[in-house]
Structure formats: structure tokens, C-alpha cells
Amino acid sequence: VFPQNFRDLTLVAGTIGDYAAMVVGKDSPVNSMADLVAAYQADPRGTAIGGGSVPGGLDHLVAAIVMKAAGENPADVKYIPYDAGGEAMAALLSGEIAALSTGFSEAIALADAGEVKIIGITAPERVASYADAPTMMEQGIDAEFVNWRGFFAAPGLPADKLAAYQDAIAKMYETEEWETVRAQNGWVNIYNNGDDFLSFLENQEQVIGDLMRELGFL
């Protein structure tokens, strides 16, 4: 997809996944993905979805993945980017956008503050840290996506140093401190290294590349 990519680096390990979420304002008449899709079908141009990334960025891609899985043409979905979370929230509350595409950890913070309702997340099942958030899958929308985090090193890293880094990361999962941070953010552990990490990245590259081509960005 890009001239430089993960193959130019030493792959250390994938660490966590942060699922994506679709949220609406706390007073919105939309209470589910079915409501959002119905509103979109009734008024496509008046039912915009916002996000904190540029067109073609992660929030846009998640909105496209979800709406495509709901049976809509992702290229037709009106996406409005915002530079800051405050701007996006103002747009959501004013009705400029009908929904906001964001990370699940950010959505949890907004929901806990009483500012939004989470109407769908891209996890395969509900996440214990915020079990009230329904998945897309349980609402009949076959959309699953995880925004992963991982570690990379410079090319040519000696094998013994690579193994030491991987061992340190693996041991991190066993600590209480890590579990506290993970649970607070709604993250899921997705530790993988070696060929498993490579296969994961290649699948992500294929899925995202295909969608970006469909949206006309590649």
C-alpha cells in the first residue's frame, strides 16, 4: 500500500488492540445501529458521520467498514473530519453529524462523562470493561476491526536483543499494573510475535488497502 512499510523494520511484537466505536449524542433519537442506518437511508447527505482523522484515515475507514457491512455503499457515506475531540463533540451535539467514529477507549471516557451513547463497537463480543456497549455483530452488522498497537525495531536488530525485547513484553502482561491500565482503557491483549505478527500485519494491509481502493484513495 505504501512505499515504506513494516517489512522494512524488525517486527518485535503486537501488544494490544483498541476496538472502534460508533457513538451518538446523549440526547440523540438514535439508540442503535439500526436507527443510524435507517436515518442514513432516509437522508444520506443529511446523516453525516464524523471522526478525528483525515478522509482515508482510521476513523473514516471504520465508518466505511461498518456502513458497508450494513449494506450501504461506503463511498457514498458523508464523512466529516475534525482536528480535535472538542470540535467533534460540538458537531455531534449540534447535529452537524449524526454519529462519531472513534476508538473504544475514547468512547468509554465520553460515555462515562455522560456525553454520548455507544451504539456499536467493532469487537467480536462485548468487552467486560464496558459491557453495556453492543457489538456490531449482535446487531446483524458483520463488521469487526481492531486498531492494534505494537513494537518495531530498526532493521538488522540482533536476534538475542529481539528475543530479550519479546520476553520483556510477554512478561508485562503478567503484572497487575498492566492489567489495571488495560482494563481502564478497554484494550484487549493481542500479543503476537514472529510469523504470527507478520501474518496479522499482512492481513491488515490487505483489508485496509482494499477498502482504500474502494473509497478512491489508492
Where are these regions (language model features)?
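Conserved hydrophobic/amphipathic secondary-structure segments
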Residues: 1-149
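Soluble non-cytosolic domains of exported or imported proteins
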Residues: 31, 57, 101, 156-160, ...
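Structural motif
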Residues: 44, 155, 176-177
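Short linear loop/turn motifs
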Residues: 77-82, 152, 195-200
